[in-house]
């Protein structure tokens, strides 16, 4: 809910105090997930897979573009970011979060209902962002939607990610 609240704020209210809802929501999701992990029978190989998904997810959400522009900036000058993973699809975080939660099931016995619920809620959030919030709060987003697929990368997007 915090992440959705942050999106509504970006598109409609523009209140400075609500700009950090997304990163705070992400931290709370991580904490809720950590509380559900079973550390008694850890699978090392799946831990490595989970770690890889987590690192890429963190990069996609907080490292591939300016965190200040994405999560702090209040003016209407935010522009679409269409490089790297965002050349593959408009919401690469959805794919990596789903991969993370699936791998956490095998690594730490995270219950499947938790993994499915968090992944489904993330997909719903991305759908709302894509349809209602990002076109209102990120300049150039409508054009970006015409060029880059929602979730499933195309061969053109895969080629684009390797361009310098």
Residue ranges and their predicted role:
Residues 87-90:
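Conserved SAM-binding loop
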Residues 1-82, 96-164:
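Membrane-anchoring alpha-helices and their flanking helix-loop junctions
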Residues 93:
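Active-site His/Glu-centered metal-binding helix of metallohydrolases
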